[in-house]
Design a protein with these regions (language model features):
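Conserved N-terminal catalytic core of the sugar/cofactor nucleotidyltransferase
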Residues: 1-49, 55-56
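Short coil/turn connectors at secondary-structure junctions
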Residues: 17-19, 42-45, 51, 79-84, ...
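Short acidic/polar capping segments at secondary-structure boundaries
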Residues: 27-28, 41, 52-55, 60-61, ...
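Conserved donor-nucleotide/metal-binding helix-loop-beta segment in metal-dependent transferases, i.e.
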Residues: 57-95
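Conserved catalytic core of nucleotide-sugar-dependent glycosyltransferases
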Residues: 96-110
Length: 214
Protein backbone atom coordinates (compact mmCIF):
# COMPACT_ATOMS: atom_id res chain seq x y z
CA UNK A 1 0.00 0.00 0.00
CA UNK A 2 2.73 2.50 0.95
CA UNK A 3 4.46 2.50 -2.47
CA UNK A 4 1.12 3.28 -4.12
CA UNK A 5 0.35 6.14 -1.73
CA UNK A 6 3.83 7.58 -2.23
CA UNK A 7 3.15 7.77 -5.97
CA UNK A 8 -0.18 9.50 -5.47
CA UNK A 9 -2.27 6.45 -6.37
CA UNK A 10 -5.25 6.74 -4.06
CA UNK A 11 -7.81 4.39 -5.63
CA UNK A 12 -7.39 1.91 -2.75
CA UNK A 13 -8.19 4.51 -0.11
CA UNK A 14 -11.65 3.02 0.64
CA UNK A 15 -9.82 0.06 2.21
CA UNK A 16 -8.29 2.22 4.93
CA UNK A 17 -9.12 0.84 8.37
CA UNK A 18 -10.33 -2.54 7.08
CA UNK A 19 -8.53 -5.57 8.51
CA UNK A 20 -8.18 -8.38 5.97
CA UNK A 21 -7.29 -12.00 6.76
CA UNK A 22 -6.31 -14.56 4.11
CA UNK A 23 -6.59 -18.33 4.32
CA UNK A 24 -5.13 -20.54 1.60
CA UNK A 25 -7.27 -23.52 0.61
CA UNK A 26 -4.64 -26.02 -0.50
CA UNK A 27 -7.20 -28.68 -1.43
CA UNK A 28 -10.24 -28.06 -3.64
CA UNK A 29 -12.93 -29.26 -1.26
CA UNK A 30 -15.61 -26.71 -2.02
CA UNK A 31 -17.13 -23.59 -0.53
CA UNK A 32 -18.10 -25.12 2.81
CA UNK A 33 -14.53 -26.24 3.45
CA UNK A 34 -13.23 -22.78 2.56
CA UNK A 35 -15.67 -21.13 4.98
CA UNK A 36 -14.66 -23.52 7.78
CA UNK A 37 -11.07 -22.33 7.40
CA UNK A 38 -12.19 -18.86 8.53
CA UNK A 39 -14.15 -20.12 11.54
CA UNK A 40 -11.89 -18.46 14.12
CA UNK A 41 -12.33 -15.03 12.48
CA UNK A 42 -16.14 -14.98 12.13
CA UNK A 43 -18.74 -14.24 14.78
CA UNK A 44 -22.47 -14.17 14.13
CA UNK A 45 -24.14 -13.97 10.69
CA UNK A 46 -21.88 -13.08 7.75
CA UNK A 47 -21.85 -12.35 4.04
CA UNK A 48 -20.44 -14.84 1.54
CA UNK A 49 -19.26 -13.30 -1.75
CA UNK A 50 -17.90 -15.63 -4.43
CA UNK A 51 -15.15 -13.71 -6.18
CA UNK A 52 -15.72 -15.18 -9.64
CA UNK A 53 -19.26 -13.77 -9.70
CA UNK A 54 -19.35 -10.03 -10.38
CA UNK A 55 -22.56 -8.21 -9.48
CA UNK A 56 -22.81 -4.58 -10.51
CA UNK A 57 -25.37 -2.08 -11.72
CA UNK A 58 -26.49 -1.93 -15.31
CA UNK A 59 -25.83 1.45 -16.87
CA UNK A 60 -26.38 3.32 -20.10
CA UNK A 61 -23.96 6.17 -19.44
CA UNK A 62 -20.88 6.73 -17.31
CA UNK A 63 -22.63 9.41 -15.25
CA UNK A 64 -25.44 6.99 -14.33
CA UNK A 65 -23.17 4.43 -12.67
CA UNK A 66 -23.87 3.63 -9.02
CA UNK A 67 -22.24 1.02 -6.77
CA UNK A 68 -24.08 -2.28 -6.36
CA UNK A 69 -26.29 -2.51 -3.26
CA UNK A 70 -26.83 -6.29 -3.37
CA UNK A 71 -24.84 -7.02 -0.20
CA UNK A 72 -26.52 -4.15 1.64
CA UNK A 73 -29.93 -5.50 0.63
CA UNK A 74 -29.03 -8.96 1.94
CA UNK A 75 -28.03 -7.47 5.29
CA UNK A 76 -31.26 -5.49 5.46
CA UNK A 77 -33.29 -8.60 4.68
CA UNK A 78 -31.50 -10.59 7.37
CA UNK A 79 -32.06 -7.83 9.93
CA UNK A 80 -35.77 -7.88 9.08
CA UNK A 81 -36.25 -11.69 9.07
CA UNK A 82 -33.32 -13.08 11.12
CA UNK A 83 -33.01 -15.78 8.47
CA UNK A 84 -30.25 -16.67 5.98
CA UNK A 85 -30.84 -15.62 2.40
CA UNK A 86 -29.40 -16.05 -1.09
CA UNK A 87 -29.45 -13.77 -4.11
CA UNK A 88 -30.98 -15.32 -7.24
CA UNK A 89 -30.94 -14.19 -10.87
CA UNK A 90 -32.98 -15.17 -13.92
CA UNK A 91 -30.49 -16.75 -16.34
CA UNK A 92 -32.94 -18.05 -18.95
CA UNK A 93 -33.47 -21.69 -19.86
CA UNK A 94 -30.29 -22.02 -21.97
CA UNK A 95 -27.96 -21.50 -18.98
CA UNK A 96 -29.64 -23.46 -16.19
CA UNK A 97 -27.22 -26.39 -16.50
CA UNK A 98 -24.37 -24.16 -15.26
CA UNK A 99 -25.84 -23.29 -11.85
CA UNK A 100 -27.84 -24.26 -8.81
CA UNK A 101 -31.45 -23.56 -9.83
CA UNK A 102 -34.16 -22.79 -7.29
CA UNK A 103 -37.91 -22.52 -7.05
CA UNK A 104 -39.50 -19.95 -4.75
CA UNK A 105 -42.71 -19.31 -2.89
CA UNK A 106 -43.64 -16.28 -0.77
CA UNK A 107 -40.07 -14.98 -0.78
CA UNK A 108 -38.47 -18.26 0.32
CA UNK A 109 -36.49 -20.88 -1.59
CA UNK A 110 -38.47 -24.12 -1.63
CA UNK A 111 -36.33 -26.38 -3.84
CA UNK A 112 -32.79 -26.47 -5.17
CA UNK A 113 -31.41 -28.55 -8.03
CA UNK A 114 -27.69 -28.43 -8.77
CA UNK A 115 -26.91 -27.92 -12.49
CA UNK A 116 -30.09 -29.49 -13.92
CA UNK A 117 -30.87 -30.08 -17.55
CA UNK A 118 -33.35 -27.66 -19.09
CA UNK A 119 -36.00 -30.39 -18.83
CA UNK A 120 -35.40 -30.95 -15.10
CA UNK A 121 -34.93 -27.33 -14.00
CA UNK A 122 -37.59 -26.16 -11.51
CA UNK A 123 -37.24 -22.59 -12.84
CA UNK A 124 -34.71 -20.32 -14.53
CA UNK A 125 -33.63 -18.62 -11.28
CA UNK A 126 -30.00 -19.34 -10.37
CA UNK A 127 -27.93 -18.88 -7.24
CA UNK A 128 -25.47 -16.16 -8.23
CA UNK A 129 -22.74 -16.30 -5.60
CA UNK A 130 -24.00 -13.81 -3.01
CA UNK A 131 -25.33 -15.05 0.33
CA UNK A 132 -25.92 -14.09 3.92
CA UNK A 133 -25.26 -17.08 6.18
CA UNK A 134 -26.67 -17.42 9.69
CA UNK A 135 -24.72 -17.86 12.92
CA UNK A 136 -25.38 -21.64 13.00
CA UNK A 137 -23.36 -22.13 9.79
CA UNK A 138 -20.31 -23.73 11.39
CA UNK A 139 -22.31 -26.19 13.48
CA UNK A 140 -24.21 -27.24 10.35
CA UNK A 141 -21.04 -27.58 8.26
CA UNK A 142 -19.72 -29.98 10.89
CA UNK A 143 -23.01 -31.89 10.70
CA UNK A 144 -22.87 -32.04 6.88
CA UNK A 145 -19.18 -32.84 6.76
CA UNK A 146 -16.91 -32.36 3.78
CA UNK A 147 -15.82 -35.99 4.17
CA UNK A 148 -19.38 -37.13 3.45
CA UNK A 149 -20.65 -34.47 1.04
CA UNK A 150 -17.46 -33.22 -0.63
CA UNK A 151 -17.85 -30.07 -2.71
CA UNK A 152 -21.65 -30.26 -2.28
CA UNK A 153 -21.30 -29.58 1.45
CA UNK A 154 -22.45 -25.97 1.06
CA UNK A 155 -25.47 -27.12 -1.00
CA UNK A 156 -26.53 -29.39 1.87
CA UNK A 157 -26.22 -26.40 4.19
CA UNK A 158 -28.64 -24.42 2.01
CA UNK A 159 -30.99 -27.39 1.78
CA UNK A 160 -31.04 -27.68 5.57
CA UNK A 161 -32.23 -24.09 5.92
CA UNK A 162 -34.64 -24.65 3.04
CA UNK A 163 -36.23 -27.67 4.74
CA UNK A 164 -36.73 -25.53 7.85
CA UNK A 165 -38.46 -22.87 5.75
CA UNK A 166 -35.68 -20.45 6.67
CA UNK A 167 -33.86 -19.75 3.39
CA UNK A 168 -34.92 -16.44 1.92
CA UNK A 169 -34.75 -15.61 -1.79
CA UNK A 170 -33.34 -12.22 -2.70
CA UNK A 171 -34.47 -11.80 -6.31
CA UNK A 172 -32.27 -9.48 -8.38
CA UNK A 173 -33.99 -7.43 -11.06
CA UNK A 174 -32.86 -5.97 -14.38
CA UNK A 175 -31.03 -3.11 -12.65
CA UNK A 176 -28.29 -5.61 -11.71
CA UNK A 177 -25.73 -7.04 -14.13
CA UNK A 178 -24.23 -10.44 -13.27
CA UNK A 179 -20.97 -11.54 -14.87
CA UNK A 180 -19.84 -15.13 -14.25
CA UNK A 181 -16.11 -14.79 -14.80
CA UNK A 182 -15.73 -18.57 -14.89
CA UNK A 183 -17.04 -18.29 -18.46
CA UNK A 184 -14.50 -16.65 -20.82
CA UNK A 185 -17.03 -14.49 -22.68
CA UNK A 186 -18.59 -13.29 -19.41
CA UNK A 187 -15.12 -12.41 -18.10
CA UNK A 188 -14.41 -10.37 -21.24
CA UNK A 189 -17.74 -8.56 -20.91
CA UNK A 190 -16.98 -7.68 -17.29
CA UNK A 191 -13.63 -6.14 -18.26
CA UNK A 192 -15.19 -4.04 -21.02
CA UNK A 193 -18.03 -2.97 -18.74
CA UNK A 194 -15.57 -1.94 -16.03
CA UNK A 195 -13.42 0.01 -18.49
CA UNK A 196 -16.47 1.86 -19.83
CA UNK A 197 -17.13 3.07 -16.27
CA UNK A 198 -13.64 4.57 -15.97
CA UNK A 199 -13.46 8.17 -17.23
CA UNK A 200 -9.81 7.77 -18.23
CA UNK A 201 -10.66 4.84 -20.55
CA UNK A 202 -14.31 5.15 -21.54
CA UNK A 203 -14.11 7.54 -24.49
CA UNK A 204 -11.13 5.90 -26.18
CA UNK A 205 -12.54 2.41 -25.63
CA UNK A 206 -15.93 3.38 -27.08
CA UNK A 207 -14.17 4.85 -30.11
CA UNK A 208 -12.07 1.71 -30.58
CA UNK A 209 -15.12 -0.55 -30.25
CA UNK A 210 -17.00 1.52 -32.84
CA UNK A 211 -14.07 1.23 -35.23
CA UNK A 212 -13.85 -2.53 -34.70
CA UNK A 213 -17.58 -2.91 -35.42
CA UNK A 214 -17.36 -1.08 -38.75
Amino acid sequence: MYPMYSKGKNHLNPLDGVEVFFHTQYEQKGLGHAIMMAKDKIQGPFLVLLGDNILTTNHSALTEFKPSTVSKELVERYNATQQPCASVYDVGIDRVSNYGIVSMQDGSITSLVEKPTSADAPSTFALCGRYLYAADTFDLLEQYSVEEYGELQSIELLRHWMRQGELGAHLLDASVAWYDSGLPLEWLKSQIDHALRRPEYAQQLRQWLDERMD
